[in-house]
């Protein structure tokens, strides 16, 4: 199959990453009985005290700090009071789906009688509120259109909606471009001059904040008979799932939201659809973690938007019928299995192409890679880009035809620390107007579209920008470790405590340890994974370890230096520990 990629190189970094231990930070005062290990891990992440490590909902930033939120509340109050038709338009990823569900559920809780929802189809409409989607939505006759998790880059779509006489409220969290859409109101913490301290609020978090502000206004106006209004914390299960799945930084504000949502899910108080999804994924709701959201719930919801239609995922999050929820969850399970197969095939193609390029470059790796295959699926290119970014430790953009045989390509970009990928695309766009049709995103991930006949020019322009913006030192991958665990800490009690701590995620990473071990035995599983039996002085018997995707044809030496996560081996009933290996180096 044809493959195209950028192959310009700077000074190559070694294939072997460098493991560096975090600087020690003295923890503050913790309650008696707190594991010293946990206090040390929190402190190393800038959370020296329980208040910083485990923020409560009472510490959330105030909604009024968001630019435009008072005007947004005014639009919604007027719409509810006058029984206007409110249309919530979501996005086809997990953040967009949960944001849509939060918007619909929350507005109905607050008294809106005519709330509808819609979501673009990735294959039909492309990203966000497009003019073609607006044309289809006209049959719903909305008075007020509310975008969630998108809209800041949808100038043409918002213009089309306004031309039909609709009011438009944009709620988004993506970085704005040089020209804002002509919406009536925009709420986005990343607007220039916005005073909201958390710039990492997810799309689902933004609409949740709008609802909180709306309830406060209605409460102050005496709308609610009980003087309080509905309990919006019942929506935090959805907020938690969307926030974690979107890989936004878990700053204290987001950790407060996610922690509260996880408590609801663990208590069995999540919405019917999420409870069904947890069951279908084989997870234990009582022990659910942010990692489970990121690796089990999020991918299953995202699979609908990648291969089918996210309307299915939103239906799951809105239904109150347990039987329907189970049926949809099983359908999502099947779609996710198909997604995994498609992703594996595309990843194999990409790895083969990159291997050829590295050979052609005498063992050097490209400074950035642009991958394209005419047979790839546009809904999966982001996963391939992420996988190749991890494999190369380079910025990667993967492209696929917008639809089979199309001349327009859809690309998904993933970056490494040191290169703001959206800013890089903005610089390409500024220097080569018309080369990119559309783009948007964040520091570490972005999306774009361009014409097939522009891909070679784009590759050259992108590589030139990367060479200019990226410090060569950033090409040397550094793995931050939380240090070595003592022999008595390699225990299921510590593994269980780490699992239920956190929540861990972007910007507040799950603990990663390192240590030197003797390899007692090893074998390869499913031709991809490396299973190890290890010995360590002071630990009786052997320690089980698994390096997923770690088999590349080279046997490990007798002694290894591992970067690993400590976990319980659920397959063995949870009593034995298992090391989840991230990096296996000669030791």
What are these regions (language model features)?
Residues 156-160, 369, 384-387, 493, ...:
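A short acidic, amphipathic alpha-helical/loop segment
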Residues 173-174, 377, 442, 529:
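Histidine-centered active-site/metal-ligand motif
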Residues 42, 146, 302, 498, ...:
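A residue-level signal for conserved active-site and pocket-lining positions in enzyme catalytic cores
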Residues 74, 78-82, 322-371, 405-407, ...:
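Mid-to-C-terminal polyanion-binding domains and interfaces
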Residues 135-204, 208-225:
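Active-site cavity-forming subdomains of large catalytic enzyme subunits
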Residues 90, 148, 170, 189, ...:
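Flexible glycine-/small-residue-rich
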């Amino acid at each position: 199959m044809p493959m195209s990629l950028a192959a310009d190189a700077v000074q190559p970094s070694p294939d072997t990453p460098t493991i560096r231990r975090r600087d020690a930070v003295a923890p503050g005062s913790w309650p008696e009985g707190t594991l010293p290990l946990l206090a040390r891990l929190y402190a190393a992440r800038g959370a020296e005290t329980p208040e910083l490590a485990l923020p409560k909902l009472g510490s959330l930033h105030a909604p009024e700090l968001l630019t435009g939120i008072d005007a947004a509340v005014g639009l919604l109050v007027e719409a509810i009071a006058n029984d206007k038709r409110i249309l919530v338009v979501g996005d086809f990823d997990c953040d967009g789906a949960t944001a849509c569900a939060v918007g619909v559920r929350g507005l109905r809780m607050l008294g809106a009688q005519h709330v509808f929802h819609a979501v673009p189809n990735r294959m039909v409409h492309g990203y966000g509120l497009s003019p073609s989607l607006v044309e289809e939505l006209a049959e719903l006759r909305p008075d007020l259109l509310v975008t969630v998790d998108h809209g800041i880059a949808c100038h043409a779509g918002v213009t089309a909606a306004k031309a039909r006489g609709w009011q438009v409220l944009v709620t988004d969290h993506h970085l704005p471009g040089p020209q804002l859409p002509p919406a009536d109101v925009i709420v986005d913490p990343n607007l220039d001059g916005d005073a909201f301290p958390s710039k990492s609020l997810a799309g689902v978090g933004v609409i949740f904040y709008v609802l909180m502000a709306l309830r406060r206004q209605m409460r102050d106006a005496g709308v609610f008979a009980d003087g309080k209004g509905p309990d919006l914390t019942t929506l935090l299960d959805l907020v938690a799932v969307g926030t974690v799945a979107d890989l936004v930084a878990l700053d204290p504000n987001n950790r407060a939201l996610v922690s509260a949502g996880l408590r609801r899910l663990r208590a069995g108080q999540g919405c019917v659809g999420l409870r069904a999804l947890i069951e279908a994924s084989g997870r234990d709701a009582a022990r659910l973690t942010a990692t489970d959201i990121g690796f089990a719930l999020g991918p299953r919801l995202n699979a609908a938007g990648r291969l089918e239609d996210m309307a299915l995922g939103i239906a799951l999050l809105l239904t109150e019928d347990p039987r329907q929820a189970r049926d949809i969850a099983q359908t999502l399970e099947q779609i996710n299995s198909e997604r995994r197969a498609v992703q594996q095939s595309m990843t194999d193609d990409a790895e083969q192409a990159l291997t050829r390029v590295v050979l052609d470059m005498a063992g050097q790796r490209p400074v950035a890679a642009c991958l394209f295959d005419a047979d790839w699926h546009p809904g999966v290119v982001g996963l391939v880009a992420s996988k190749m970014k991890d494999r190369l430790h380079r910025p990667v953009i993967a492209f696929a035809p917008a639809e089979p045989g199309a001349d327009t390509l859809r690309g998904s970009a993933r970056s490494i620390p040191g290169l703001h990928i959206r800013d890089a695309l903005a610089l390409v766009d500024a220097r080569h107007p018309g080369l990119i049709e559309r783009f948007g995103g964040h520091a570490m991930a972005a999306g774009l579209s361009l014409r097939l006949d522009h891909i070679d020019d784009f590759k050259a322009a992108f590589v030139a920008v990367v060479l200019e913006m990226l410090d060569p030192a950033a090409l040397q991958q550094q793995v931050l470790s939380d240090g070595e665990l003592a022999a008595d800490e390699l225990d299921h009690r510590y593994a269980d405590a780490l699992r239920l701590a956190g929540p861990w995620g972007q910007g507040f990473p799950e603990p990663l340890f390192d240590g030197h071990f003797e390899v007692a035995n090893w074998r390869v599983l499913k031709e991809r994974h490396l299973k190890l039996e290890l010995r360590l002085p002071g630990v009786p018997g052997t320690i089980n370890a698994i390096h997923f995707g770690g088999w590349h044809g080279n046997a490990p030496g007798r002694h290894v230096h591992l970067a690993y996560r400590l976990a319980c081996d659920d397959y063995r009933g949870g009593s034995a520990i298992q090391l989840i290996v991230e990096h296996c180096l000669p030791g």
